[in-house]
């Protein structure tokens, strides 16, 4: 926030123009590699599937023998079509001024931001007006008005088992003109569900263009505060702020993809009130005793209401505007619902007492009592004390001999508690939802009335405040007149009674219930250092660095020593279904799966009478892991493993790898993180860089796991990541141009002499150590070059200051991670798709459908008149 200064009127402008594009996309198969993979996979599914692929792409001696011709075809990567180079601009004007009694500041800002995804953009207009009026010598009035409105278009919220329309765009067929010369509709049955990979209507560009997704919001906040200095140092202050907000969102499908126009209209309104009253008394007793006392009260209130209209089946002539205007005319289905939130009320009382002795010993104690209507009456109040002590050791007389090299040395110690009620207001008692007048209800007396059902969460009247206990020991230091300065923090934070949605027995009729779940802790060290390396004349060189070591732990788990849960990205196509786990005493968000041992080689089998028979001592795998795993081999009865199949460790040494061999694969969050900055100044030029890094973390690469599985019929015709070309192969193309199964052991061994990955034909995604990759990285986050024009150039045009700058972000990343970006966190606090505020267990460091990170180039100006 900015406050007006006394004096002449000041006008300043800050603005920039920004160009951004995606920094990296997934490398995919060449056209011929794509053909061979899908031809082979279709053959493994059956002759009907193989014939459809051959007919569509013109393969084999039966359909034109065009396999070799695809070596000269350039693969079309549709990711390049759905992403673009985007232009954004941001402007802010500030006008301030006033007299000794009245100070005013006005700010107007505008942002227009194109998204790197086609048909997406965001714009925001904001204005604020602040005035401070001295009503009397001891009486001040502060008034603040803020208005904001924003529009968001093209939000990417369409996801499925393969990701989003953006992250999954690469899967669409990369060949624009298949050489078979037939329409996809002629072979659709042979592609089964995979027809979407070649269907013109599922072209990623068409999918995005088919959807109009807009949201609009605006808010107005006004506040007024009165401060009265009753006696010297004793100030009473009372502040009241009111907020009013409204929102509208629309979702429209044009029907190009599924032939059925659909629309959803949401409206919402909300009101908020905040009242804060404080008494603050600062006084001294003698020269060496300084006191500060504060007493206060805060009241928070919020209410909201919303409505939703959903329809399906509109005339083909209806466009977006017509459909939204006549949304109630849906012919296939229609529903309308209204909801009113349970009002949220919070009342707090707090106090603080600070005491400083001789400007060397500092004591602070605070206490809060918070009451929230989000909990049942017996649990509404939480009490949170805190205390801190600091010692300016460098000011002690016995440290006088260090003054020439020690500028500052301060020790700090603190202990405190804080509470959180970050949940909805309706979780402690049963609430009901309207089914809407348009739903398929049974009429009563020939009419549809109002129908209600319980909300989707099981009520819990025992909910109480989530509490965090913070413990900290710190050292602030400075050397050589503070040319070297920094701090060292040692911390231990514990959070107990976490408010989380926990799965419950389905026999209750519910899926989840919010509970106070367990206790977690974070222990760590943070070191920050700043060094003025050179500060001479016109040149200055400064270095800053931050290092953090953090270790999290699940200290307590209710009712069990471990708890399994799922990331849900693949639903039933994920093995094991629960791919994350809590283990008491271990880190949070452990990944669970199988230990990969590569793939079964030809040498793991005896080739007897045309059959690949597992050698003694080599464990088999069960179909419970792979589901359908297609291959062309003849196997003994009861055997699942074959050359090229994914191979996992038999942890329990039962002789067969099954679901009992799923184990903890380790933690994913990095323990070591940090950043460092290099800053240069020479005369009017400035150059700064900021690097971020992590070490020791893992990324759960679900995106790669999807590429390594067949996904049954859904996978036919899908493009894959380029590394799939190095996977095990069981088919080859002969001299006549026909595909054949390679069953001879010697030929199979030679064909796969350089294979790096297992045969990607199994139906389910199998979580294994193969998909936990090193997520360490070093990133140049920002690079800025600035120039401040000399003042003698500006005086004639009545300009006080002009600074021009160029900034680039995300210029490069050094990492061994094979995915698009190692800095991922899909669903860090839980799965989406249930309830908007459902805080389920965290699926940390999971790379699935991650929106691509942008690289930006910005030119800006800071001007003061």
For every predicted segment, state its role.
Residues 2-219, 225-227, 290-291, 422-441, ...:
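Membrane-proximal, glycine/serine-rich, low-complexity loop/turn segments characteristic
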Residues 12-69, 308-312, 427, 515, ...:
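Conserved small-residue
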Residues 51, 65-66, 79, 372, ...:
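Extracytoplasmic gating/loop element in the C-terminal half of outer-membrane beta-barrel translocons
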Residues 60, 86-89, 124, 130-139, ...:
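Extracellular/periplasmic, surface-exposed regions of secreted and cell-surface proteins
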Residues 70-71, 258-260:
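Flexible, solvent-exposed loop segments that connect beta-strands
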Residues 214, 664-669:
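Short, glycine-rich nucleotide/cofactor-binding loops
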Residues 652, 668, 686, 690:
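Segments forming glycine/polar-rich beta-alpha architectures that bind adenosine-containing cofactors
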Residues 660, 670-684, 781-786, 790:
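Conserved SET/PR-domain catalytic core that frames the SAM/AdoMet-binding pocket
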């Amino acid at each position: 926030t900015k406050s007006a200064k006394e004096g002449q009127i000041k006008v300043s402008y800050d603005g920039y123009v920004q160009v951004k594009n995606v920094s990296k996309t997934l490398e995919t198969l060449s056209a011929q590699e794509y053909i061979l993979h899908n031809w082979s996979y279709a053959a493994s599914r059956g002759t009907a599937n193989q014939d459809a692929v051959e007919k569509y792409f013109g393969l084999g001696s039966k359909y034109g023998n065009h396999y070799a011709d695809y070596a000269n075809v350039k693969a079309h990567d549709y990711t390049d079509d759905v992403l673009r180079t985007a232009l954004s601009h941001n402007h802010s004007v500030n006008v301030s001024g006033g007299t000794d009694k009245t100070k005013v500041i006005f700010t107007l800002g505008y942002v227009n931001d194109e998204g790197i995804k086609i048909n997406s953009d965001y714009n925001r207009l904001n204005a604020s007006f602040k005035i401070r009026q001295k009503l009397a010598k001891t009486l001040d009035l502060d008034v603040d008005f803020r208005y904001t409105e924003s529009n968001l278009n093209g939000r990417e919220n369409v996801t499925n088992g393969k990701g989003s329309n953006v992250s999954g765009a690469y899967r669409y067929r990369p060949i624009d003109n298949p050489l078979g010369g037939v329409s996809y509709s002629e072979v659709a049955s042979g592609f089964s569900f995979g027809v979407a990979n070649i269907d013109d209507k599922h072209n990623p560009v068409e999918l995005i263009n088919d959807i109009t997704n807009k949201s609009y919001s605006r808010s107005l906040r006004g506040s007024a505060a009165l401060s009265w200095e009753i006696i010297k140092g004793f100030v009473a202050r009372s502040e009241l702020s009111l907020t009013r907000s409204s929102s509208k969102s629309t979702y429209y499908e044009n029907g190009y993809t599924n032939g059925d126009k659909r629309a959803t209209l949401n409206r919402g309104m909300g009101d908020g009130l905040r009242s804060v009253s404080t008494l603050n008394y600062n006084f001294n007793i003698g020269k060496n005793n300084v006191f500060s006392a504060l007493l206060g009260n805060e009241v928070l209130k919020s209410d909201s209401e919303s409505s939703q209209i959903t329809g399906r089946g509109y005339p083909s002539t209806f466009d977006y505007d017509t459909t939204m205007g006549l949304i109630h005319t849906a012919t296939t289905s229609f529903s309308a619902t209204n909801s009113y939130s349970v009002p949220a009320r919070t009342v707090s009382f707090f106090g603080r007492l600070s005491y400083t002795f001789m400007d060397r010993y500092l004591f602070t104690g605070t206490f809060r009592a918070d009451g929230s209507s989000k909990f049942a009456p017996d649990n509404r109040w939480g009490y949170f004390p805190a205390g801190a002590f600091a010692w300016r050791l460098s000011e002690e007389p016995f440290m006088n001999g260090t003054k020439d090299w020690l500028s500052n040395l301060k020790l700090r110690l603190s202990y405190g508690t804080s509470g959180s009620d970050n949940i909805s207001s309706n979780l402690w008692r049963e609430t009901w939802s309207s089914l809407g007048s348009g739903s398929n209800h049974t009429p009563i007396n020939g009419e549809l009335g109002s129908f209600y059902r319980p909300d989707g969460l099981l009520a819990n009247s025992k909910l109480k405040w989530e509490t965090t206990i913070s413990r900290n020991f710190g050292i602030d230091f400075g050397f050589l007149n503070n040319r070297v300065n920094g701090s060292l923090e040692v911390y231990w934070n514990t959070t107990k009674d976490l408010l989380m949605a926990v799965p419950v027995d389905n026999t209750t009729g519910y899926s989840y219930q919010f509970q106070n779940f367990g206790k977690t802790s974070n222990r760590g060290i943070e070191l920050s250092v700043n060094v003025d390396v050179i500060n001479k004349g016109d040149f200055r060189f400064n270095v800053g660095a931050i290092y953090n070591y953090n270790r999290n732990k699940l200290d307590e788990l209710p009712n069990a020593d471990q708890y399994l849960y799922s990331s849900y990205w693949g639903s039933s196509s994920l093995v094991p279904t629960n791919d994350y786990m809590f283990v008491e005493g271990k880190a949070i968000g452990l990944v669970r799966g199988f230990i990969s041992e590569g793939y079964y080689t030809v040498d793991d089998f005896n080739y007897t009478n045309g059959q690949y028979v597992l050698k003694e001592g080599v464990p088999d795998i069960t179909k419970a892991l792979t589901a359908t795993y297609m291959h062309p081999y003849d196997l003994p009865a009861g055997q699942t493993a074959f050359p090229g199949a994914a191979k996992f460790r038999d942890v329990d040494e039962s002789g067969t790898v099954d679901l009992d061999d799923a184990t903890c694969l380790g933690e994913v969050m990095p323990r070591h993180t940090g950043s460092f900055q290099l800053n240069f100044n020479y005369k009017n030029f400035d150059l700064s860089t900021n690097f971020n890094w992590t070490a020791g973390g893992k990324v759960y690469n679900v995106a790669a796991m999807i590429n390594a599985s067949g996904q049954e019929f859904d996978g036919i015709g899908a493009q894959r990541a380029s590394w799939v070309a190095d996977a095990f192969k069981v088919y080859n193309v002969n001299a006549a141009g026909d595909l054949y199964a390679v069953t001879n052991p010697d030929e199979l061994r030679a064909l796969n002499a350089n294979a790096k990955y297992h045969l990607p034909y199994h139906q389910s995604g199998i979580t294994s150590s193969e998909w936990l990759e090193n997520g360490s990285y070093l990133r140049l986050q920002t690079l800025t070059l600035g120039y401040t024009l000399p003042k003698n150039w500006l005086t004639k045009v009545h300009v006080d200051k002009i600074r021009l700058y160029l900034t680039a972000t995300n210029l490069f990343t050094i990492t061994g991670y094979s995915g698009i970006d190692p800095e991922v966190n899909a669903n860090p606090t839980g799965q989406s798709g249930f309830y908007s505020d459902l805080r389920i267990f965290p699926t940390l460091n999971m790379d699935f459908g991650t929106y691509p990170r942008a690289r930006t180039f910005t030119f800006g100006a800071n001007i003061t008149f």
